[in-house]
Regions:
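His/Asp/Glu-rich, glycine-adjacent segments
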Residues: 3, 13, 93-269, 390-393, ...
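Beta-strand elements within well-structured catalytic alpha/beta cores of enzymes
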Residues: 35-54, 68, 253-259, 275, ...
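Active-site regions of metal-assisted phosphoester/phosphodiester hydrolases
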Residues: 545-589, 613-614, 618-805
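Metal-dependent active-site segment of extracytoplasmic phospho-/sulfohydrolases and closely related
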Residues: 285-322, 431-433, 477-479, 707-730
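Alpha-helical membrane-targeting segments
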Residues: 1-30, 168-235, 345-373, 377, ...
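Active-site nucleophile/metal-coordination loop of metallo-enzymes that catalyze phosphate/sulfate
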Residues: 10-39, 49-174, 185, 337-374, ...
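Active-site neighborhoods of enzymes that stabilize oxyanions during catalysis
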Residues: 119-132, 141, 145-152, 348-532
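A long, amphipathic alpha-helix that forms part
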Residues: 15, 233-234, 238, 246, ...
Length: 805
């Protein structure tokens, strides 16, 4: 009854959903008939180091992410971005599996002899086309929001990305028209965005003025004001709404990137209050996206939340050394350079958003950008530098031999105070010149990374070697990171791209039970996340894997769960969703009640087999109700280990029962670490007298009576009875209720899932089993997957030798 009411209410909510209206009136194509297929929502917080996330959570700036972790819904992993630790390289590896596909955010494209900036559509398209020739994009068939690349998404599904922000792209794909329709359909959201923009503007203008009076460059301060308002608020709200529409449509993969924190952290530093201010809004946006994904009726979505890299608090060569790094290089090379009064050094030039319009002003601006990308006459005679961060690439007009490179690198470190210089010799070996001397890469580089986690050192060293061997890497590569602190070559206070401690440690939040590559236990890198995503979407298998959040303790986790025919509170029949509940909790033994087998109401599926297949578990089905040719109905037992069936039988009923439905029980024995565990799963009747008769039978000589005192026993299921009833007292007289076994534990109700008020699902255990923990997970998934909540117990048991003794 409760499920029908909730399903009815959800139906009418969908009818009046603005997301559904947007799908209909924007001419978007929903994906139908795929409700049981997986969907992946990737949410990226650009530039947020794991350390900064933990600090923000501790200060209460991200309450939703805190809730996800504290309630056990998500486990946190370190996300290592590779080298360079910048978004274009990370997303190239994430989408296409190409490591160090580009050597930096800005570098010299040796083919065209022009400076590439991985924010301009022409460069993004060029390099992404090369990646696409090597592998299929992770987002194929899906959508990409506010990223560098499309990731394989179609042009019409690529929004505010580096590859599709040109006006022509937006016009051809109909996005300009859709913006106007969007304003009409999402008018409340538009009003809210406008209000947020005005509020942020009121806060930002005084702060920008204060920055100017403190000596900051006026154009940078007001450029930051625009970034804060347009990217931190406007773009965040637009991609959030767009992402909600896309998961409502049922696209297989959706990737949304929030840029606001990264932009502000570059300006003021990654730990600044200024940058952390943006995280509260991002947290709320993630909450909205998470809710939309779990409400979607067209896909079974997983939501993975990550940051592509962190940032380091830095000092700047551009602001502390007149002439910047270009002047330092020229002095060390003893090469006089003519200063162009009309042009600042490249390392001191800002990055401007590309012009979108076709006006004459925009055309002139594009022409200036094209000219700026070309090497100057002076650069073609001496050297050029691409250094938009803590990694700088230096390209010589005239080749240098190994001796010359080494001598220059030593001068840059000793005389120019550059923390480190990498170069590749003629034998294809990479060397790292630093204050202490020189080190071969990757062999000796781990020793220079002693402050990093041990698991990361060798990986960073290998990636630095790969970076230097990129075809577009500099003849020498400057590193701003060293033992004496972090420096950047651009005018910024927060930076990333190198091997610093925090820039190499982002974060990844995934539900427990998520399958990750087996070698990603210490950290997850972009190619690992790609492999996990492709496996989850069914595109490619994981050759070997581990479960995120899996326990290592030697104990048993038991779950009992009334699955309600796998029919959720939204009216959707989904065995896959029930499997997700089990997977999230990493249960070892699972007793499921109300499982269909071959019934027309559930697509004639074998639900127990489908759930077991999704988990890779053993399964036994116990039918209790036969519907002739229309299938069977009963309960099932799933296990990580082989199942030995001892007995399957019908339980006695009461002749005068007002609902005379057949009831049965399944008794199985499972060997765990050499110990035989007896488990009986059942679903008792609805009348009080019937339940008393059935409980006496289960505890009698034909069932568990003879072994309760001598062997480990678990009796679990939906008993349709509450504590204090006669049959409960019968069970408690010989076995222990796991929810009453531990002092201080407050028993939790399991029915109904939306508003639990009854404790009718139970796990009883014999004295051989110690209850370490009993809990009822209540989250967005368990509230909707069935009309009951699952009950779990962590049980410890003595060894086989102790039992024998």
């Amino acid at each position: 009854m409760f499920a029908r009411i909730e399903s009815y209410l959800r139906f009418w909510r969908r009818r009046f959903s603005r997301n559904e209206w947007a799908i209909r009136h924007l001419g978007l194509t929903p994906v139908e008939g795929k409700s049981e297929e997986p969907g992946l929502l990737l949410i990226q917080i650009d530039g947020l180091a794991r350390r900064q996330l933990e600090a923000a959570i501790a200060k209460g700036r991200m309450p939703f992410l805190k809730k996800l972790q504290e309630r056990g819904h998500y486990s946190m992993h370190t996300f290592y971005p590779g080298q360079p630790s910048s978004t274009p390289a990370v997303q190239g590896e994430l989408y296409y599996g190409v490591r160090a596909g580009v050597p930096a955010f800005s570098f010299l494209d040796r083919e065209s002899k022009r400076i590439a900036v991985m924010f301009r559509p022409e460069w993004v398209k060029k390099f992404e086309s090369g990646f696409q020739a090597q592998a299929e994009g992770l987002l194929k068939g899906g959508s990409s929001w506010s990223n560098i690349y499309s990731g394989g998404a179609a042009p019409e599904e690529t929004h505010f990305c580096g590859s599709s922000i040109g006006f022509g792209d937006m016009w051809r794909t109909g996005k300009i028209r859709n913006i106007f329709i969007f304003v009409l359909l999402q008018f409340p959201a538009v009003v809210r965005i406008a209000g947020l923009l005005l509020l942020e503007l009121a806060i930002a203008i005084p702060q920008a003025i204060r920055g100017v009076f403190r000596g900051q460059w006026i154009m940078r301060e007001f450029g930051m004001l625009v970034s804060r308002v347009c990217i931190g608020i406007g773009l965040r709200e637009l991609v959030t709404i767009g992402g909600q529409v896309d998961v409502t449509r049922g696209l297989p993969a959706v990737h949304i990137n929030f840029l606001g924190y990264d932009e502000l952290a570059h300006r003021r530093g990654p730990g600044s209050l200024f940058a952390h201010w943006s995280l509260s809004g991002i947290d709320r946006a993630i909450k909205d996206l998470y809710g939309a994904a779990h409400r979607s009726t067209r896909r079974d979505y997983h939501v993975w939340i990550f940051s592509d890299h962190g940032q380091e608090r830095t000092r700047s060569f551009a602001t502390e050394f007149p002439g910047g790094v270009e002047k330092i290089i020229a002095d060390c090379m003893e090469t006089p350079r003519e200063k162009d009064p009309q042009r600042r050094p490249r390392s001191q030039q800002g990055v401007h958003a590309p012009a979108l319009s076709r006006s004459s002003h925009a055309e002139r601006r594009r022409a200036r950008e094209q000219a700026a990308n070309a090497l100057t006459e002076e650069e073609t005679k001496t050297f050029s530098v691409a250094a938009m961060g803590p990694v700088g690439h230096v390209y010589f007009a005239h080749p240098m031999d190994d001796t010359q490179k080494r001598a220059l690198a030593l001068r840059l470190v000793k005389q120019g105070k550059i923390p480190g210089v990498l170069f590749r010799d003629r034998s294809d070996r990479v060397w790292w010149i630093h204050e202490q001397g020189e080190t071969a890469v990757p062999d000796g580089a781990s020793a220079l990374l002693a402050g990093h986690p041990a698991s990361l050192r060798a990986e960073i060293a290998r990636d630095l070697d790969t970076l230097c061997k990129n075809e577009n890497a500099g003849d020498i590569v400057l590193l701003g990171w060293g033992n004496n602190g972090a420096w950047t070559f651009a005018a910024e206070r927060g930076a990333h791209a190198g091997p610093g401690l925090h820039e190499t440690q982002g974060f990844l939040l995934v539900p427990p039970g998520t399958r990750l590559p087996a070698d990603s236990t210490a950290f997850v890198r972009p190619s690992d996340l790609r492999a996990a995503g492709r496996a989850f979407l069914g595109h490619a298998p994981l050759e070997s894997s581990h479960h995120a959040g899996a326990r290592t303790e030697t104990h048993l986790r038991v779950m009992t769960y009334n699955a309600h025919g796998c029919s959720g509170m939204d009216g959707r029949v989904s065995p896959r969703r029930i499997a997700r509940v089990v997977q999230q909790q990493s249960a070892d033994l699972i007793a499921l009640q109300e499982i269909d087998h071959g019934r027309s109401r559930s697509r004639s599926e074998d639900q127990a087999a489908l759930i077991a297949e999704a988990l890779g578990y053993h399964v036994v089905f116990c039918p209790t109700v036969m519907h002739g040719h229309s299938g069977r109905y009963g309960h099932a037992l799933l296990s990580r280990w082989p199942i030995e069936v001892i007995k399957v039988a019908e339980l006695p009923g009461a002749p005068d029962s007002w609902w005379p439905e057949p009831r049965g029980a399944l008794w199985a024995r499972i060997e765990v670490n050499g110990v035989d565990i007896n488990i009986v799963t059942t679903h008792l009747g609805l009348s009080p007298r019937e339940r008393v008769i059935q409980m006496r039978a289960l505890l009698g000589n034909d069932w568990l009576g003879p072994i309760i005192s001598s062997e480990p026993v678990i009796l679990c299921g939906d008993f349709n009875l509450s504590p204090g009833s006669v049959p409960y007292a019968l069970a408690a007289s010989k076995l222990r209720d796991v929810q009453a076994a531990r002092e201080g534990h407050r028993p939790r109700s399991t029915f109904s899932s939306m508003h639990p008020f009854m404790r009718i699902d139970h796990i009883f255990v014999s004295s051989h089993l110690e209850t370490e923990r009993a809990f009822v997970p209540r989250n967005d998934l368990t509230r909707i997957a069935s009309d009951h909540l699952p009950l779990l117990a962590d049980l410890s048991f003595p060894s086989a030798s102790d039992l024998t003794t």
